[in-house]
């Protein structure tokens, strides 16, 4: 596939464009160790030119329980944003908001903290998330997800209202 071809040819810019366009769909089907290996070969300077690809990779790292690597990518994303002040305000807001959404998953079972990050994302974003598919709402179509996040006896109604308010993206 394209990722292998671009890696073998050393065309890491094209590889980053594929990751960005794919938005993590293909990555989810790959062996995480392969993606980590490719990521290790990709020059940081190239990665920093593709902040959306970094965000897609951050989400993949979360899915694969590679939290230290996710946080390393977050630092690289922050450096990328600092190095590109020329980004249009709308694009910058969308990227920063997407980052907040991805980071919110680190606050599993803490609706208040997740909500804070979701609200921050909503204030910054003008488009739906690229790396997080919103079909099925915040429970991703699974009632068991609701039960994972519900934590206060008698508080379900207010928790649902809080999530509905802060999850437009």
Q: Which residues are covered by each model-predicted region?
A:
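Extended alpha-helical scaffolding segments used for macromolecular assembly and cargo binding
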Residues: 1-53, 57-60, 69, 73-76
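Internal alpha-solenoid helical repeat scaffolds
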Residues: 45-169
């Amino acid at each position: 596939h394209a990722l292998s071809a671009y890696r073998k040819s050393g065309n890491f810019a094209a590889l980053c464009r594929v990751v960005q366009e794919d938005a993590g769909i293909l990555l989810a089907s790959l062996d995480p160790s392969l993606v980590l290996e490719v990521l290790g070969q990709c020059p940081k300077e190239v990665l920093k030119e593709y902040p959306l690809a970094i965000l897609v990779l951050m989400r993949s790292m979360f899915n694969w329980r590679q939290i230290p690597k996710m946080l390393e990518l977050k630092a690289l994303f922050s450096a990328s944003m600092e190095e590109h002040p020329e980004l249009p305000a709308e694009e910058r807001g969308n990227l920063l908001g997407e980052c907040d959404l991805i980071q919110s998953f680190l606050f599993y079972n803490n609706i208040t903290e997740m909500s804070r990050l979701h609200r921050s994302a909503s204030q910054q974003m003008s488009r739906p998330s690229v790396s997080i598919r919103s079909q099925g709402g915040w429970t991703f179509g699974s009632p068991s997800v609701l039960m994972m996040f519900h934590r206060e006896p008698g508080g379900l109604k207010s928790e649902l209202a809080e999530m509905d308010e802060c999850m437009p993206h």
